[in-house]
Regions:
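Internal alpha/beta loop-helix hairpins
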Residues: 1-32
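Short aromatic-glycine-enriched beta-strand elements
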Residues: 23-26, 86-92
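Glycine/charge-rich catalytic "coupling/switch" loops of P-loop NTPases
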Residues: 24-80, 99, 109-138
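Canonical phosphoinositide-binding patch of PH/PH-like domains
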Residues: 101-103
Length: 138
């Protein structure tokens, strides 16, 4: 968990429910099902996390406003703040009550007030045990 607070902006954290279907594992964040890659899925299956709530962490650079980049793991949200910082753009938005930040291409056309489908790179996601705060997979 501590690693999530290193860097600026810090990692996005969302509570998620683990859903196992054979070898497939999704993290359910409200109405969104985010499919985990096989290596990360195995850690959750082996740990007996089916049906349990975990904490999903994803860094802002692993969230894009190009949903086609990660079609199996998208969330839709209204942009609350657009922040241009030199060669970087940060987009701030809420997903199912959780604050999120995306660091996106500075040429983005996304702006404050726009509703955007964001793609999450699930190969880069970190999953933590909600009770012990220990890393399950990263």
């Amino acid at each position: 968990f501590v690693a999530g607070f290193i860097g600026s902006p810090q990692m996005n954290f969302l509570d998620a429910t683990v859903k196992v279907n054979g070898k497939d594992v999704t993290l359910q964040v409200g109405n969104y099902s985010l499919k985990l890659p096989e290596n990360k899925a195995k850690a959750l299956i082996d740990g007996g996390y089916d049906g349990k709530t975990v904490v999903m962490g994803i860094r802002p650079e692993d969230v894009t406003d190009d949903a086609t980049a990660f079609p199996e793991s998208t969330v839709e949200a209204k942009i609350n703040v657009y922040e241009l910082l030199g060669a970087e753009v940060f987009l701030y938005f809420d997903v199912e009550g959780f604050n999120m930040t995306a660091r996106v291409d500075p040429h983005t056309t996304s702006r404050t007030g726009d509703t955007v489908k964001f793609g999450l790179d699930m190969t880069k996601v970190h999953v933590f045990d909600k009770e012990t705060e220990l890393t399950i997979t990263n």
